[in-house]
């Protein structure tokens, strides 16, 4: 089959069989079977995900990463290859990322068989990008200890950029993503005896107000930050004073100092609630993803490889405000660079955003990704 047939076949199979983070068992088996068909050795440091390796002629080792997990979303696309899993969908394009890396593996194996693979290549089929921090898990498991990786590259489909456009940015390209949760415990009473209670309802109102003011009064207005309240609840019945309260949300920032400011303010809010309302209040933070930092040292190689792949380069002036665990590779493993590949096509109706029930794209965009990957490999220079 030709390459367009290859990416169409594999991407649509993966699209029909999405799996959630840390449960990508069938996806992992599918990738392993593909690698076995090429007689390529691989490791599985975690229960899901695969790390493959090909030895080239050069002394350098570079890595390429694709995430393989899906989202808990009910697909609404009316296509023959729609998800066969109830309320699970590849709504972030990871089926495309995985397919592109599979085709790149095929090309690299062909080059190796011909004695023309220029450098050593590590292929990272990574689980749990959406939740679970799969990149960090792999690094902590020692998955890359035996590879002297010098650079890590990755891509993400971007339905807000037209086909044929590649979006890049040096330094911060995506924000940190940190979840926070407030837990309030007070004393309930009948509403007729509310003076005897310690109301978590009133306390929660205070928390809501104070959180909403963090962005306005404590963060630089020229920087892009999000302090989002996603869900809150107090009490159980209409005629009782709430004895409990709960609030959760997410923080998005590309500046670690700003994240520290937000966390400190939230701790102060929790302490103020205790004093003002005589209720217990605790704030907890889930381990988030740090900002994805693109190494400027790799910029020239990235841009040249994209242009040679017939992609138009757009230099984004500000970072995206969503999180991405590719960030761990640049933070802990090696200089890294993350590129967004445009997939928007209004004529074909491919216009909806990531994490939506109608996300779709033309598989031919994946050929450009593989051309970009190959150009990077053929012209790689140590940084």
Curated annotation (Swiss-Prot):
Its EC number is 3.-.-.-. Keywords: Hydrolase. It is an enzyme of class 3 (hydrolase). One of its GO terms (molecular function) is hydrolase activity. Coiled coil: none annotated. InterPro entries: Amidohydrolase (IPR017439), Bact_exopeptidase_dim_dom (IPR036264), Peptidase_M20 (IPR002933), Peptidase_M20_dimer (IPR011650). The keyword Transmembrane helix does not apply. Gene3D superfamilies: 3.30.70.360, Zn peptidases (3.40.630.10). Pfam families: M20_dimer, Peptidase_M20. Belongs to the peptidase M20 family. This is Uncharacterized hydrolase SA1230.
């Amino acid at each position: 089959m030709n390459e367009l047939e290859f990416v169409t076949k594999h991407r649509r199979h993966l699209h029909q069989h999405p799996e959630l983070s840390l449960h990508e068992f069938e996806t992992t088996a599918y990738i392993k079977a593909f690698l076995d068909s090429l007689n390529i050795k691989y490791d599985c440091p975690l229960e899901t995900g695969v790390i493959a390796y090909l030895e080239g002629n050069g002394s350098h080792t570079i890595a390429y990463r694709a995430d393989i997990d899906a989202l808990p979303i009910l697909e609404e696309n009316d296509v023959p290859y729609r998800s066969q899993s109830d309320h699970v969908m590849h709504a972030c394009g990871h089926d495309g990322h995985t397919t592109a890396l599979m085709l790149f593996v095929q090309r690299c194996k062909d080059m190796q068989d011909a004695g023309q693979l220029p450098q050593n290549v590590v292929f990272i089929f990574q689980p749990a990008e959406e939740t679970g921090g799969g990149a960090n898990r792999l690094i902590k498991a020692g998955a890359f200890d035996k590879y002297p990786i010098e650079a890590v590259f990755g891509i993400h489909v971007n339905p807000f950029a037209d086909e044929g456009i590649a979006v890049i940015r040096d330094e911060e390209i995506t924000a940190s993503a940190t979840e926070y949760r407030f837990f309030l415990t007070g004393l309930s009473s009948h509403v007729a005896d509310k003076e005897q209670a310690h109301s978590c309802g009133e306390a929660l109102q205070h928390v809501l107000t104070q959180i909403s003011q963090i962005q306005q009064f404590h963060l630089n207005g020229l920087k892009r930050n999000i302090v989002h309240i996603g869900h809150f609840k107090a009490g159980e019945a209409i005629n009782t004073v709430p004895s409990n309260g709960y609030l959760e949300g997410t923080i998005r920032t590309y500046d670690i100092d700003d994240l520290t400011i937000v966390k400190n303010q939230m701790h102060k809010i929790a302490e103020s609630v205790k004093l003002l309302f005589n209720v217990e209040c605790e704030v907890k933070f889930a381990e988030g993803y740090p900002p994805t930092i693109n190494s400027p040292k790799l910029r020239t190689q990235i841009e040249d490889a994209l242009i040679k792949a017939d992609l138009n380069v757009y230099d984004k002036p500000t970072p995206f405000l969503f999180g991405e665990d590719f960030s761990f590779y640049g933070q802990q493993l090696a200089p890294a660079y993350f590129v967004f590949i445009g997939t928007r096509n209004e004529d074909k109706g491919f216009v909806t955003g990531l994490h939506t029930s109608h996300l779709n794209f033309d598989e031919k965009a994946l050929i450009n990704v593989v051309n970009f990957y190959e150009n990077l490999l053929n012209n790689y220079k140590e940084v």
